[in-house]
Amino acid sequence: MAGASPSPARPRVVVAGLGDTGLLVATRLARSCDVVGIATRPALVSGQELGNRLTHPDQWRRTYLIPYRRFRRLDRARTIHGRITSVDLDAHEVAVEAADGAIEVVPYDVLVVATGASNGFWRHDRVEGLPAIEADLADAAGQLAAAGTVAVVGGGATGVSVADNLARRGGTEVHLFHSGAEPLPGYHPKVRRWMARHLRDDGVVVHPDHRAVVPDGFTGDRMTTDPIEWSTGQDPFTADLTLWAVGGVRPHSTFLPAEVLDDEGFVRVDEHLRVPGHPEVFAVGDVAASDPLRSSARNWGYRVVVANVRARNAGKDGGLKRYRAPEYRWGSVLGLQDDGLVVVQPDGKRFRVPRWAAEPLLFGVFVTHYLYGGLRAATTRDPSA
């Protein structure tokens, strides 16, 4: 546990989850509120850019694996390394089991749920420290580096990112299997057609219209070596290693009462990202049922939550901001490459940021200073050192 001591003069905001979205909420509110951030790890471990994470882990960790002690804006907040076990919405309290086994009940004036969701081996809610994080990162990258043939099952952004980055790195025969005619469901049709061409140009062997039979009880939380069976009638396929990116997202919401969850376990929210019936509770990111694509993590949902928490604290519940999601997904799919960073837009257009500009300006200035509010230099004990 670390951070500032609470002040009774300021509202207490508990931020459940300090991932990509929760971290931005916590750092924005820490100046005007007593923020308590609760996270299952002692560092930001981003779920973004899995392809770069597996093929260029040193580059990836500089931006996406950062101990919380390096975030200057968290100096004003308190962080608890542990897991929320329950929430009493009437008493305005969360129960936390810390990593050392200690139990603490934390009261709140406002609760922001940003606990994310599990998906494959790269996104989970296990309570772990930096050594375990580093071991998992090295193990996954090592398995892929040793494989001569890799099958990636799933044509979403994660599967596409892994397949293309592996093929670009070279030395591996990469096969991408997806159930539809084109990859990237949820993206604009122009983006989907472009990506299908791009994958083939980069050397990925693309297999459309293949729907895998997922073994009973398997959640994609490990890479496998068994033959892949298909419900669409094709012959089984065997690779040295198979990475599963077939969706099956599981929200981290078991600590919440069922009354605030939808049928899939995601947190129900209104247009202001508030939980209906509980105006002091907000949800944002992958755990929030904010729109059909549950895209508030990528569409500046944190800004809506921050503005609305501030408005509520000021007694201005009538002027809350509304969250609006575009029809299609957008953003960087492949991550930073030798020729730069390609960003696709909701309208199907795309633009490229040259690498010479992306590294110092996008990651060095925009991410480090604007989004994160400044980082302390890494030390020898930090993974990004």
For each feature predicted by the language model, list its residue ranges.
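A Rossmann-like FAD-binding core segment of flavoenzymes
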Residues: 74-94, 106, 171-269, 317-320
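FAD-binding core/adjacent interface of flavoenzyme oxidoreductases
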Residues: 2-16, 74-151, 232, 243
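FAD-site-proximal beta/loop scaffold in flavoenzymes
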Residues: 130-148, 236-301
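A conserved FAD-binding loop/helix module that cradles the flavin
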Residues: 269, 284-336
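Catalytic nucleophile loop
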Residues: 19-22, 156-160, 302, 306
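Beta1-alpha1 glycine-rich phosphate/pyrophosphate-binding loop at the start
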Residues: 2-78, 164-190
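Glycine-rich active-site loop/strand segments that organize a redox cofactor
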Residues: 37-59, 114-143, 342, 356
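C-terminal auxiliary extensions adjacent to catalytic cores
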Residues: 2-4, 335-385
